[in-house]
């Protein structure tokens, strides 16, 4: 006598499968913090080099940081944001500037 598989016992049974709802990963804002020592042109260079901003947009962000105390450079996944923060802070120290970059959940 042939063995029956579990599928053969389930005649007429319909199983609905659904994909689990997966929330998108959280996004993080990368911020520059104003200080009284870092030259404005250095901040613009950082924005262009690390955040791929055009000169006009980099200048706008730099002025926002200068007048408001901090400004958003971009919004990224956690890993990318952490990497950008580390790169900017290291670049600032290597160039002997106190410019600080940080991140917070968007």
From Swiss-Prot:
Per its UniProt entry, which superkingdom is the organism in?
Bacteria
Designated gene of the protein:
clpS
Single biological process term from Gene Ontology: proteolysis
Species for this entry:
Xanthomonas campestris pv. campestris (strain ATCC 33913 / DSM 3586 / NCPPB 528 / LMG 568 / P 25)
Which portions of the sequence form the region Disordered? 1-21
Q: Which HAMAP family match?
A: ClpS (MF_00302)
Q: Which InterPro entries match?
A: ClpS, ClpS_core, Ribosomal_bL12_C/ClpS-like
The role this protein plays is:
Involved in the modulation of the specificity of the ClpAP-mediated ATP-dependent protein degradation.
The record describes its quaternary structure and partners as: Binds to the N-terminal domain of the chaperone ClpA.
Which Gene3D superfamilies does the entry mention?
3.30.1390.10
Family per similarity comment = Belongs to the ClpS family.
Alphabetical list of Pfam families matching this protein? ClpS (PF02617)
**SUPFAM superfamilies per the record?**
ClpS-like
Designated name of the protein: ATP-dependent Clp protease adapter protein ClpS
Basic and acidic residues composition-biased segments? 1-13
